[in-house]
Amino acid sequence: MSTYAIIKTGGKQVKVEVDQAIYVEKLDVEAGAEVTFDQVVLVGGDKTVVGTPIVQGATVVGTVEKQGKQKKVVTYKYKPKKGSHRKQGHRQPYTKVVIKAINA
C-alpha cells in the first residue's frame, strides 16, 4: 500500500501521493523552487495517523513546476427591460507542485 497524506493549503484540503502533480492556489515562490507543506491533516499507508488537528512533525515536500492561470470564467449580469448589463471575466492563478516526499 502506498503512502499518502492529506494537506491543507490555500484554504482547501488535498490528498497527495509521491510523484503526483497537484494544482493549488497560487504560492509566492518561483518555478523550480522547493516548497514544504507542514499542515498535514492525515498520513496514511500501512499505519494511518490522524492529526488533532494536524499531525505533529509530519511534512510534505514538493517542487514547484510552474505558475499559471486557469481558463477564463465569464460572468454576465443583466436586468431585463432596463438596458443594464455587465460582462466580466476572471482567471484564477494557480501553482503546479510535484510531490517529492512525505515525511511522517
From Swiss-Prot:
The keyword RNA-binding applies. GO terms for molecular function: rRNA binding; structural constituent of ribosome. GO terms for cellular component: cytoplasm; ribonucleoprotein complex; ribosome. GO terms for biological process: translation. It holds the Pfam family Ribosomal_L21p. Part of the 50S ribosomal subunit. Contacts protein L20. This protein binds to 23S rRNA in the presence of protein L20. Belongs to the bacterial ribosomal protein bL21 family. This is Large ribosomal subunit protein bL21. It comes from Streptococcus mutans serotype c (strain ATCC 700610 / UA159).
